[in-house]
Each structure stands twice: as C-alpha cells, then as structure tokens.
Amino acid sequence: MSGYGEIDVVLPAFAASALSFVFIAFLYMKINAYPTGVNIDMDARGNPGPKGTLVDELSKQVRDGSIKFLTVEYTYLAVFVLALAGTLFGLFYATESSLIATSVSVSFVSGATLSASAGWWGMMVATDGNRKTTSACAGCERYNKKATLNDGLEVAFTTGAVMGFAVVGLGLLGVSTCFLILSSLEFEGETEAVNKKTMQCLAGFGFGASSIALFARVAGGIYTKVPFRRPPPPPSAP
C-alpha cells in the first residue's frame, strides 16, 4: 500500500474545488442577468431596435462559429490524445510495469479531458459575454442609463473569472481524484520508491492538461485571425 493513502491530504483540495464550482454558478447567474443587445435598444413600446438586433445577430454568428471550430479541433485532439496515450503506455510498459503504464496513460487522458472541458466551458461563456459587454458599454436610452466603460469592465471581468475558476476547480478536482486513486494502488518497492512512482503517474495528468491547453491556445489564436467574410454593417451600426 502506498504511503499516500490518507484522505485528509486531498480533503482541502476537494473543498476548494467545490467552492470554485459554487462561485462559478454565482457568476453564471450574474452574467445571465446582464442585458443583451435587444434589451438595451428598444423604443418606448418595447420593440427592439436595429442596433441591439445587430449586436445579438453578430454574437450568435460568433458563437456558432466557435462551436463549429471547437468541434473540429477537439475531433483532431481526441485522435492526438489517444495516440499519445497509447505511446505512453507502450513506453512505460517496456521500461516499468503494466500497472504504471496504465496509470500514466489514464491520468494523461483524464487531464486532457478536463482541460478540454474547461476550454469548451470558457468559450461558451466568453462568446455570450461579448455581446453583454458591448451592451453594458452602450447604455440604455429607454431607462436613461448612460454608457460607461466601468459597466463593460464589470461584465468582462465577471465573464473572464468564470474561465479562471473553471480551470482551478477542474484542475484541483482532477489532480486530487487521481492522487487519491493512485495512492491506493499496490506499487512494488519501499515507501520512497512507491511515492516516486505515484508522483510519476500523477505527472501524466498535468502532461495531458498542458497538451490540450497548448493546442487550444495556438489554434484559437489562428482562428481569431481568420477574415470574417460577411456583408459590411449598415452605417447606423454601433
């Protein structure tokens, strides 16, 4: 039995992860309460105006494009993750043991999966936050609300915080769970050697998470630079 079998070691991490998810839920409800483009551009009768409609239309196009992009990207990344997991299994099976090989490859896939989940979650919130940040900066004539950059900053900061806490929460949850499972495995050797093997397998989780984050950052940067071919907006557009 590994020397890392104490549940007390991971309890603080589990608690911090749970608090992160609770705070994310609070932020998400706060974001949903912010006005959209249609909400800020209405006449006295409550009919939506052209500017607000255009903001929501552009936001929907960006969101749909982001979903299609992530779907294609994650399809290729799934092949990459499975191929690299198989490679890691083969390398550690040849040099260590089948138990370590399985532990490293499963930890790698787990880290990659949670990292991809955080990226998808962040993209969905970010695309929705774009239009609400624009709406907050535009103000609302119907309710005599002047446009201020501070309102837009508040929305943007709240939206970005969701992604930040999602990364932290999912990371802590994944590392703690992997640590708890790996510490219960029957590795061969003395306590020091067992501890080293546990950390060796746990490193696979970080490797998987970092791999997805690297490709998401590079590919996402390229995607945002692709020319957006659509008819030019009308002169009355914001």
Locations of regions flagged by a protein language model:
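Hydrophobic, small-residue-rich transmembrane alpha-helices and their short perimembrane loops
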Residues: 2-238
